[in-house]
Amino acid sequence: MTKSLLSLAVTAFILGGCSLIPDYQTPEAPVAAQWPQGPAYSPTQSADVAAAEQGWRQFFHDPALQQLIQTSLVNNRDLRVAALNLDAYRAQYRIQRADLFPAVSATGSGSRQRVPANMSQTGESGITSQYSATLGVSAYELDLFGRVRSLTEQALETYLSSEQARRSTQIALVASVANAYYTWQADQALFKLTEETLKTYEESYNLTRRSNEVGVASALDVSQARTAVEGARVKYSQYQRLVAQDVNSLTVLLGTGIPADLAKPLELDADQLAEVPAGLPSDILQRRPDIQEAEHLLKAANANIGAARAAFFPSISLTANAGSLSPDMGHLFSGGQGTWLFQPQINLPIFNAGSLKASLDYSKIQKDINVAKYEKTIQTAFQEVSDGLAARKTFEEQLQAQRDLVQANQDYYRLAERRYRIGIDSNLTFLDAQRNLFSAQQALIGDRLSQLTSEVNLYKALGGGWYEQTGQANQQASVETPKG
């Protein structure tokens, strides 16, 4: 009988060669073959290493930021959830894949029963015994039309999409930590600038007030000087609050507090980032994990159509076992005590009020939805990269212009202060020079922050942030199908 069970399993695999999953065709990318061109864009540069393969330690030069990114990759809760989701979908795939194989189980049982005389066929009371041992297969579905294989394929693609989702989460985390860090650094620089400016304003206010007491400055001059002081105090409180909130944001991203032994940060205007090559739009289809995730979900929806189609056809399940049955435990495995059971069952759908057709329509609609999501993901990626490329050149020009503006305001401030001290110009001109310089310095810090975050977002948009070191892409194998 054991040979019969083996033959049955082999027959099931031979019969189960039909699949109703539609042939998969990758949708055309609904974007241009080249990045936008124009006055706002620099010529795209080629490089030996794509941005997605550039390690974040090589991209970010600030040792303090590198330390924070490493901390976040260990402790961040969103990344932990993404990893657990990956494990969960892997387990679900293994559960579904198990339905491809017959579940073989062994059972053993024994019973003793006393039968009273009035219930016995012989008219006498007695004790009956029965022992059994069986090995068999229970309700194994012959996958003649590929329903189980379609569901297994769907589970596999869902699992693979979760792997790409985990990559997306890490890439987003690296960019978020970098942007939060640069915001923290910029707000600290603004706070320090405001603190120094407030001291200057207070000195000017005290000087103007003393001048008013001796009749040199007017009450209007005193009022204007005080206005500048109070305005700086408003900024002082604002940046003090922002610095504290920046620390709180970083703490959440890190999953723990900022390390006490944090490395010394680079200055905000130092060489913070490496150059990232844009490559071609077709490259992001292979390197952006969110695009890969969307395609795996599309393949999962495509596989589900096969399962919905298979539901229209008969399903056959088999139950079979072989074993021994004996009233005496000692003779359970003796010759002549063998027993077997073979119980096929067929289920043929006849009338279901259109539910099977509706299920098939639903699965096709879900595929169309996933096609649209896949195309939208590509379009979003194209926009993000295009925005980053436009920002690269324009921010360079904007920053240079802002530096020139700061220099011009510093010259204006020095001249206005000198002329005010010797009594040529009024206090109003001096206060105007102070305000203009303060505003220009704040704008320079803000523009530098915007430039840094734009480059970080471009690195993220190109798929960068998954590898710690450049060159790891060639060392790591692609995701493997999990084994039982």
Swiss-Prot record:
Gene Ontology MF, one: efflux transmembrane transporter activity
Keywords: Antibiotic resistance, Cell outer membrane, Lipoprotein, Membrane, Palmitate, Signal, Transmembrane, Transmembrane beta strand, Transport
Residues lipid-modified (S-diacylglycerol cysteine): 18
Subcellular locations according to the entry: Cell outer membrane
Secretion signal span: 1-17
Residues with a covalently attached lipid (N-palmitoyl cysteine): 18
Membrane topology: Lipid-anchor
GO cellular component: cell outer membrane
Record GO biological process: response to antibiotic
Chief location of this protein within or outside the cell: membrane
Function: The outer membrane component of an organic solvent and antibiotic efflux pump; confers resistance to toluene, hexane, p-xylene, ampicillin, penicillin G, erythromycin, novobiocin and tetracycline.
Family, per entry: Belongs to the outer membrane factor (OMF) (TC 1.B.17) family.
Name of the protein in its database record: Multidrug/solvent efflux pump outer membrane protein MepC
Organism: Pseudomonas putida
Organism phylogeny: Bacteria, Pseudomonadati, Pseudomonadota, Gammaproteobacteria, Pseudomonadales
